[in-house]
Amino acid sequence: MSAAVLAILDSDLKAAQPALHKARQVADSTKAPLHVLVNAYSSAMVRAVGVDHERQDAARAQIHKAWQNRISELTDRERCQLSILWHKDSMAALRESILDLQPAMVVVHTSEESGLRRHLFTPRDWQLIRKAPCPVLCVHDRQWPSSPRILAALDPGTEEQPENALALNVLRAADHFASNLSGGLRAAHVLDEMDDSLILLVGEAIPDYSVGMDKVRQFYRDRFQAFATDHGLGPDQITVLTGPVAPTLAKYCEELDMDVLVVGTVHRNLPERLLLGATAESVITRASTDVLVIKPDGFQSPWQA
């Protein structure tokens, strides 16, 4: 049997559960099993019931049954496996379950936390982006149309490393995603340049700087176009953008009403590990586009260290 698509549900029993709906679409389109997971632990119930073990067991059984009924309302129980957990530490429960299940993909409803709270506490989707050993699809409430619009964010390489393996993985994942869901595929490369004030300062110090930057821009445009052509993308499917990566991608996704952005994580040496998933996380906070995060070859999950 192929690896399952794992839908992680929101803990609110009455929530719409967009992660479940989209995980089911992905599973159906790839003929993969669907596994539904929810941590039903309720601290409010624990406080209300107190230390009486019989009352705790009875309350847990009622909550378990309520979740079974709710999931039956949302999907065909016979077509999916169901894990209803009871764990005070929700991230520890997710970690253990994901490592045990080894899913092909994790689908999660992206956090609604405010920007400040995201810096104070690490929400569930950020943890999964950084640490899950498989692709992670972070979804918003908006439903996909019958033909979803898929954008692959690509960095095709540098002069020193002309073939970027992660870019290939991202493009393949985006292509498969679009094909399986009968969607349309586009690809974009973002040239992350200095802001205008810095360019003016550098231009005054180095007279030929602007000419040199034009050559650099053209070099990366040509490299991206060659990469796209080599991998079957037509001129009408590719776009070169300029600006800070995350806000530029988010703005482009909004302007073209993209449904899913496919990005790769950055997993470098120890001092740079905080950068892992930074682009994906920033886009999630800026746009309503769903984000599929692809891990690089040889990715070492901190959960498996």
Can you describe what each PLM-predicted range is?
Residues 108-127, 260-286:
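Glycine-rich, Arg-bearing micro-motifs that act as flexible, cationic patches
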Residues 1-54, 149-207, 296-301:
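Small/aliphatic-rich secondary-structure junction motif
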